[in-house]
Structure formats: structure tokens, C-alpha cells
Amino acid sequence: MVQLAPAAAMDEVTFRSDTVLSDVHLYTPNHRHLMVRLNSVGQPVFLSQFKLLWSQDSWTDSGAKGGSHRDVHTKEPPSAETGSTGSPPGSGHGNEGFSLQAGTDTTGQEVAEAQLDEDGDLDVVRRPRAASDSNPAGPLRDKVHPMILAQEEDDVLGEEAQGSPHDIIRIEHTMATPLEDVGKQVWRGALLLADYILFRQDLFRGCTALELGAGTGLASIIAATMARTVYCTDVGADLLSMCQRNIALNSHLAATGGGIVRVKELDWLKDDLCTDPKVPFSWSQEEISDLYDHTTILFAAEVFYDDDLTDAVFKTLSRLAHRLKNACTAILSVEKRLNFTLRHLDVTCEAYDHFRSCLHALEQLADGKLRFVVEPVEASFPQLLVYERLQQLELWKIIAEPVT
């Protein structure tokens, strides 16, 4: 479904009316996508890297040695409270005007007069070009060290990439795909969920977790840095094989925390897990026992784009929650996508609206065994991955508790 231009432009994606491309890949320059192979169905597979905005020391302190999530020191952009000029706090060069000096008590009228010359024209006080000027005409320019929240244009993929191994997540993925293959791409909801997992290390550390609709496996890779075991599940041998390759590419991350990632098939439209040993990525009886005996966390990212599949996801969540021996928490990420529809002649969010109705139905479920508590998660936690955190990106938490 992806058409490639010949020769030098072979990594340029040609859009078709029946393909979908994630914004994560759309806004990434072409030269950062390294085409590595063709998958079993003939789709080009690309390799991209995602940089974690933390230092090696922070990783060691917070992850490998069991620190709390508050120990993770991130690189944060300048605060919006420092004024539109971007001046650091305390510099005295905010929105007050360059002619004002710290500690001077002046009125607005005096400020206006100070900025006019003898002819009544505006006299703009300019900062010197460099702090080394011997006779500056005004206050010296403060040294500012900007924080760049993006990869450099000359980024190199592969072993030559700069940074420690714990700073980089390498993911194989496809580009523009039909709707049924969107799991082969990386979506913003997976990056938001990964940020939350890194923030709530106390929730994930030492647990057994299961991801539904894992796709490329990015969220499972992050979870494995803290969890004891992560069951990374989806359907389709080709997708699961690519997911397995991504687990191997990032095995050093899971090894730091001692976690294990098991890639397995889990079909939401079936009640039972596949145990046929002849089927790739099937379940053993030992794995099924471990899943039901120890799992306390379920999570899923960006799997709510089709109403029938959304219904299947919630049925699977309910079924798993009833079979687990322990109370569990489910973390779901979703992007509220706005579309203009001819049927309504208005901007609607039908897939999101159906997702919310399913949340409400689950919360109202009363079978005498489990009680489901649904609550939104405020996306105010630190951002450790480079992506655009839109207002339309949401996290929801579902707590399944036994009825007492």
C-alpha cells in the first residue's frame, strides 16, 4: 500500500486515499527514517529512534536502583511565567521595558517619557551585540542557554547515534498503511502512555503487566524497565514479529530493570487465549497461569478508532479483570480526533464519543463480582519523550475492585 519513488528518493512516502500516516512520522524529516527491510507482506520497514530526555545518572538513580518516580530529573523548557521575551527569572528584562532598572520606582508616564527623544520620537534602547562591548548603550544581554526539545538535523541512526544506550529507544515501524495495519506505526498516544509509565514507576515496579494492542511495542519496552514481566499482545504474525524485533533492539533497557517482555497473540474477538504450539506467539499453560495469578496492570494506547474494535477491547478488559486473581488497574490512552462529517455537517468525534460511552457502560456494570471505577488522569506529568502533547491526548484509569 506504500509507494516508493525510485533511486535517491526511495524513502519518500507517496500518500494514497486508502492509507493512514501517524503524525509522529508525518512531522519527522525523511532523512531520520532509515528503511531497513521489507516485511513478509512487502511493506517497507523503517527504523526510527526516540530520545529520552533524561541523563544516565537519573536513569541509574530512579530505575536501576529503585528510586521513586520523583527522582527522575527531566530537561524542561523555560517556564511560560518568565515573560514573552524569554528572559530568565530575576534578570530584570521582562515585559517592563528595557529602560527600567531593578529597584527603580517609576510610573507608566515616566517610562513613556524615557523612551522619547527631544523631538518626541520613539527612542528605542538597544542592547549591545555582545556582552564584551566596552561601552554598552543599555543593559547587558543575559546569557541564555536554550533547551532544544528536538533531535538535531544531522541525527544519525544506528550504532553511531550520540548518547548513552539508555537515552535511545529504537523502533522498527512502517509508514503510511491501510487502516487495518495502523498498529505497525508509532502513535502519539503510545508516547503519552510511555511518559506516564516513566512517571508512575511506583505503580509499575515489580509488577506483572499486559498490554492490549501493543503494535510496535514501545509502551511495553518502557514498562519492562520497571515491571517484572510484561505480556506484549496483539494479533497478526507479521506485526508480532516486528514487535519481537523491537524488543530485541531495546533489550538493554529491560535488562537494566530486570524485566522480561513476552510477545503473545491475544485476539479481542476470541474468549480464550491461543495455546496451539504450532501457532507462532501462542501461550503455554505456565504463561497463562502466571498471567492470571500475578497480573495487576493492564494498559493500551490508541486502540479506539473503530467502534466494533472498541467494544471488543472493553469486553476483553472486563473478561481479563474477572479472571485475574488480584485487583487490577487499567491505563488507557486515546486521542480525541476531530473530523467533519457529511452525515452531521459538523465537526464530530464519533470514535471518541463511543469510547466514552463504553467507559460509562463499564462503570455502570453491576454483576456482583467486580466494581469498575473510572477516572481521568491529568496529563501534567513530565514529558520525557519528544512529541507534541496535544490537549486532545487523554489518559484514563480504570480500577477493578472486588465487590465486598
From Swiss-Prot:
Q: Which top EC class applies here?
A: transferase
Q: What is its EC number?
A: 2.1.1.-
Sequence positions bearing Phosphoserine? S132
Region annotation (Disordered) ranges: 60-102, 115-145
Location relative to the cell: Nucleus
Composition-biased stretches, type Basic and acidic residues, lie in: 68-78
Alphabetical keyword list: Methyltransferase, Nucleus, Phosphoprotein, S-adenosyl-L-methionine, Transferase
Output the Gene Ontology terms for molecular function: heat shock protein binding; protein methyltransferase activity; protein-lysine N-methyltransferase activity
Q: Which GO terms describe its cellular component?
A: nucleolus; nucleoplasm; nucleus; protein-containing complex
- What broad class describes the main subcellular location of this protein? nucleus
Q: Which residues form a coiled coil?
A: none
Q: Entry's InterPro entries?
A: Methyltransf_16 (IPR019410), METTL22 (IPR038899), SAM-dependent_MTases_sf (IPR029063)
Gene3D superfamilies named in the record: Vaccinia Virus protein VP39 (3.40.50.150)
The biological processes this protein is annotated with in GO are: protein methylation
Q: Which reaction does it catalyse?
A: L-lysyl-[protein] + 3 S-adenosyl-L-methionine = N(6),N(6),N(6)-trimethyl-L-lysyl-[protein] + 3 S-adenosyl-L-homocysteine + 3 H(+)
Any one Pfam family match given in the protein's UniProt record, by short name: Methyltransf_16
Provide ranges: composition bias, Low complexity. 79-88
Task: Tell me, in a sentence or two, what this protein's role is.
Answer: Protein N-lysine methyltransferase.
**What's the family?**
Belongs to the methyltransferase superfamily. METTL22 family.
Q: How does it assemble?
A: Interacts with members of the heat shock protein 90 and 70 families; these proteins probably are methylation substrates.
Name of this chain's protein: Methyltransferase-like protein 22
State the organism named in the record. Homo sapiens (Human)
Lineage, highest ranks first: Eukaryota, Metazoa, Chordata, Craniata, Vertebrata
